[in-house]
Amino acid sequence: MGNFTVRATAGLMLASLSTLAHAAKLEDTAPYPKAEAGFTRQVIHLPQQAQEENFKVEILAGKTLEVDCNRQRLGGTLEEKNLEGWGYPFYRLEKVSGPMSTLMACPPGTQKKRVFVPVIGDGFTVRYNSKLPIVVYAPQDVEVRFRIWSASDKIGVAIPE
């Protein structure tokens, strides 16, 4: 193994362990409320990045459903709230509608499969901040996943016309 591979692997392991260490300390960060009946409180802990302003977090809330060949989606809005007295953001997905799908005829013999169907709507892209957890309150039957987006180093220039 090359020196870079060893360092990259060690760095990833350290970031993962750091994230796990943070994961047990939500109550130490701030008094986020417990989830109400019918909801779960799901938490995302982010590793520290060198230039966090170049990153965004896409929150992927959804359900694993049995679907055919059509494109499926759920509907909803992720609302940002503030933890009173602290000013820390948290997010609430109040209700989820659907599923909705395209209505194309599937080719004969196409099997149904179980896939993660995301909620599509407003508010699902949030600022990257490794100093605070991303706390999401979602209905019990909704799973929360996330994806990290990063800005390209290449910056284009607009042309006056």
Swiss-Prot record:
Disulfide bond found in the keyword field: yes
GO molecular function: serine-type endopeptidase inhibitor activity
Function of the molecule: General inhibitor of family S1 serine proteases.
A Pfam short name: Ecotin
Species the sequence originates in: Pseudomonas fluorescens (strain Pf0-1)
Protein name (Swiss-Prot/TrEMBL): Ecotin
Source lineage: Bacteria, Pseudomonadati, Pseudomonadota, Gammaproteobacteria, Pseudomonadales
UniProt superkingdom: Bacteria
InterPro entries in the record: Ecotin_C, Ecotin_sf, Prot_inh_ecotin, Prot_inh_ecotin_gammaproteobac
Main location: periplasm
Signal peptide limits: 1-23
Subcellular location: Periplasm
Encoding gene, per UniProt annotation: eco
Keyword Acyltransferase: no
Record-annotated disulphide pairs: C69-C106
Annotated keywords: Disulfide bond, Periplasm, Protease inhibitor, Serine protease inhibitor, Signal
